[in-house]
From Swiss-Prot:
<keyword id="KW-1003">Cell membrane</keyword>
<feature type="transmembrane region" description="Helical">
    <location>
        <begin position="4"/>
        <end position="24"/>
    </location>
</feature>
<keyword id="KW-1133">Transmembrane helix</keyword>
<dbReference type="InterPro" id="IPR007382">
    <property type="entry name" value="UPF0756_TM"/>
</dbReference>
<protein>
    <recommendedName>
        <fullName>UPF0756 membrane protein LSEI_1366</fullName>
    </recommendedName>
</protein>
<feature type="transmembrane region" description="Helical">
    <location>
        <begin position="52"/>
        <end position="72"/>
    </location>
</feature>
<feature type="transmembrane region" description="Helical">
    <location>
        <begin position="85"/>
        <end position="105"/>
    </location>
</feature>
<dbReference type="GO" id="GO:0005886">
    <property type="term" value="C:plasma membrane"/>
</dbReference>
<feature type="transmembrane region" description="Helical">
    <location>
        <begin position="115"/>
        <end position="135"/>
    </location>
</feature>
<comment type="similarity">
    <text>Belongs to the UPF0756 family.</text>
</comment>
<keyword id="KW-0472">Membrane</keyword>
<keyword id="KW-0812">Transmembrane</keyword>
<dbReference type="Pfam" id="PF04284">
    <property type="entry name" value="DUF441"/>
</dbReference>
Length: 153
């Protein structure tokens, strides 16, 4: 019962915040939860969902390359600019932080609750997008490391 109230609360916040992605996500999970035969799929979604999402995002990012909108010329031009190097550095940083964050979530699954809550606040009230839980867990890992608070260490 508690899980239903939690999901309904998130759905209500998503509706008030007019966040379509969160509305669809919560609704899909609620429908799956209603069907007893989908419990294994829910576990699979929990363990592999982020990987599936990253795959979809990666494919979307590749479309301009596939359509010819972006080619080697654009890559060379961006490498010549300070903004391009900053973007490359940020990409590297996010990849490393995400890897650390996934490790933190594996060591301390209860951290997921706080990250999800923070993500919901950011999505609904600050008009963010829910692509950040893994990055947020990476930032959390860095901060916890600085203060020597990483669970399991």
């Amino acid at each position: 019962m508690e899980s239903w109230l939690f999901l309904l609360g998130i759905l209500a916040i998503a509706i008030v915040g007019k966040n379509k992605s969160l509305i669809i996500g919560v609704s899909a999970v609620m429908v799956l939860k209603l069907i007893p035969q989908t419990q294994n799929f829910l576990k699979l979604l929990q363990t592999q969902g982020i990987n599936w999402g990253v795959t979809v995002i990666s494919a979307a990012i590749m479309v301009p390359i596939a359509t010819g909108e972006i080619g080697f010329k654009e890559l060379l031009n961006v490498i010549k600019s300070p903004a391009g190097w900053i973007a490359i550095g940020c990409g590297v940083l996010v990849a490393v932080l995400s890897a650390k964050g996934v490790g933190l979530l594996a060591m301390s699954p209860e951290m997921t609750v706080a990250l999800v809550f923070g993500t919901i606040i950011g999505v609904v009230f600050l008009k963010g997008i829910a692509a950040g839980p893994v990055i947020a867990s990476g930032l959390t890992y860095v901060i916890l490391t600085v203060f020597n608070l990483v669970p399991g260490h």
